A protein has these predicted regions:
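Conserved catalytic core of nucleotide polymerization and phosphodiester-bond processing enzymes
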Residues: 1-2, 6-172
Length: 172
């Protein structure tokens, strides 16, 4: 997981070695093998940066535009802009999906003794009568798992986990 997370943020062999407390050569080997094993990731990164440099923007899967005006800068600013350009379509698509689910949710739960309270990243928190938890989970799961549709038919299904508790921490 260190590799998947660090990859999006452009970690170097030096940075990975420092984080894992291993020799730099070994860390660079991890990075090289990672990109050999998952060549599509490098391709995505390269294509996204190229597009951002040519257009000063990137887009989410839903076509929402995220501007990247610093992408052609020099020095550390360019590195930050490059990492942001790579990450923005991924996090932006996740934000688009949760937003679409939130827009659909009030209608979906209108007849239930439940209220959507807040959103935190990719989670929605509800207040619900205890005897309605099961039916609410079914409705919420359906709304969230199909939130990308009909605009997108995803190749990988969205899977929703649910928890319950007297408070947010307990629900995890």
């Amino acid at each position: 997981s260190e590799m998947c997370i660090r990859d999006r943020y452009g970690i170097s062999g030096f940075g990975l070695a420092r984080n894992l407390r291993i020799p730099r050569k070994e860390a660079q080997g991890f990075i090289d093998r990672y990109f050999q094993r998952f060549p599509g990731i490098r391709e995505y990164m390269d294509e996204t940066v190229k597009f951002a440099k040519e257009n000063a923007r990137v887009e989410t899967l839903f076509g929402r535009v995220i501007h990247t005006p610093e992408i052609n800068s020099k020095g550390p600013t360019a590195g930050f802009a490059k990492r942001a350009a790579i990450n923005a379509p991924i996090q932006g698509a996740a934000a688009d999906i949760i937003r679409r689910a939130m827009i659909r949710m009030p209608k979906a739960i209108a007849t239930m003794p439940a209220k959507m309270l807040l959103q935190v990243h990719d989670e929605l928190l509800f207040e619900v009568a205890e005897d309605a938890v099961g039916p609410l989970v079914e409705v919420v799961r359906e709304v969230m798992e199909t939130a990308a549709e009909p605009v997108l038919k995803l190749d990988v299904p969205l899977i929703v986990d649910a928890g319950q508790g007297a408070h947010w921490a307990e629900a995890h």
